[in-house]
Amino acid sequence: MRIIDSHFHWQPPEISDALSKRTEFPRCEADGQGGYRFYRKAGVKSAHRTAAWYDLDRQFEYMDNLNRGKIDVISSMGPFSVFYSELPVDEGREGALAWNEVMAGAQRKFADRFWGTAAVPLVDTQVAIDVMNDAIGRLGLVGVNLPCSIGEDPLIDHPRLEPFYDRVEELDVPLILHPTDSLYGEDFSKGYGGTLHATLGRVVEVSAAATRLILSGVMERHPNLKVLVTHVGGVLPYQAGRYDKNGGPAKLPEPPSNYIKRFYTDLVAPSALGMEFALKFFGVDHVTYGTDYPCWMPHEALELFDQQDVSQADREKIFSGNAMKLFKLRQPVAV
C-alpha cells in the first residue's frame, strides 16, 4: 500500500549555514556534530536541529528499512518557518527564495518520492504573496508553511494579511500550520529540560494560532481555504464544546466547531487514542498520515496506526489518497 508522510522535516544544510553567518538575531550556530542550534534572541535557544534533520539520503534509507515499501514525503519547515518572518524584509525575502529553490531542487532529485513546501516572509504581506506566487507557480512547490507568529507582531489574524489569504485561496494550495517555538519558549515552559515546551507549549501555540483563524473570521471569509493543523489539531478537537460555549463574542454565523472540522490534520499524536479521536472528530477525509520525522519515529507511528479500526479503503485514503488530493500531488514531480 502506498504511503505518503505528510508531516516530514528535512532541513537543508546550506540554509542553516547561511543563517549561522548572521551576527544579529535571529541566527543559528553549528553544534559541532552536524546539527545547528537556533536562537531568536540573545541567550534564548528556540530549537536544536540534530544531524538527523540534514541528511535526506539517510532519512530515506531509514524509511526504506521499515519494510513497508517506498514511503514518499511532503517536507515542511516545522518550527523554522518563523525565521523568515523575523528577519528584515529584504533578508527574509532572499532567505525564503533560497529555501524554496532548495526544495525545488530536491523535488527534481527525488522526483519519485519528495515534494517540498514554500517559505514565505510574512513580515511584509506583498512580499509574502510575491514569494508564494513564485514558489507555487514557477517552482511547483505543493504547500505553504504558515508560522504561528510573525516577527514583531505575532498574530496571524492581522487584517493586513487578508490579501495573503485571498491569494492562498485563489492558488488552492494548503497552508501548513505548525508551532514555531516562539510564543511559549521562556517563562511559560522553562525548566524540566524543555519537556513542558515540547509536550504542551507547542500544542498550545498551534491551537491558539488555529483559533485565531476561526475567531477573526478568516475561515468564514475564505470558505475554500485549506489549512492543515499539525499534531492531530492540537487541543481544538478535544475542546470543541468549549469553543461553541464561549465563542459568542466572535459573532460568527456558525458555531466555532464547524470551522474546526473544516481543518485538516495529521496523525502525530503520538498515541493510539489520540489517533482514534482525530479520525472520529475530523472524519477520515480530513486526516493525513504523518510522523513528524525526525522528531518522532515512523516505525512507532505505523505501529499505532495499524491498531486503528478503519477499513482498507479508508486506510488507503489516510496513507496517501487524502494527501494526494489536498496537495494536488503529481508523480513523478514535474518541475
Q: Where do the model's predicted regions map?
A:
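Aromatic- and acidic-residue-enriched segments that line the glycan-binding/catalytic groove
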Residues: E14-R27, D90-G92, M132, L161, ...
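Mid-to-C-terminal alpha-helical segments outside catalytic/metal-binding sites
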Residues: M1-S6, Q11-I71, E101-K109, D130-D134, ...
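Catalytic metal-binding/acid-base residues of hydrolase active sites
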Residues: H9, T180-D181, I214, G233, ...
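Aromatic-lined glycan-binding groove of carbohydrate-active enzymes
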Residues: I214-I260
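Alpha-helical structural signal in soluble globular domains
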Residues: V102-K109, D134, R138, P163, ...
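Active-site gating/metal-coordination segments in enzymes
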Residues: K70, S75-A209
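Hydrophobic faces of well-ordered beta-strands that scaffold small-molecule active sites
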Residues: I4-S6, D72-S75, W115-A118, V144-L146, ...
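A general structural motif
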Residues: S207-A210, N246-G248, L267-S271
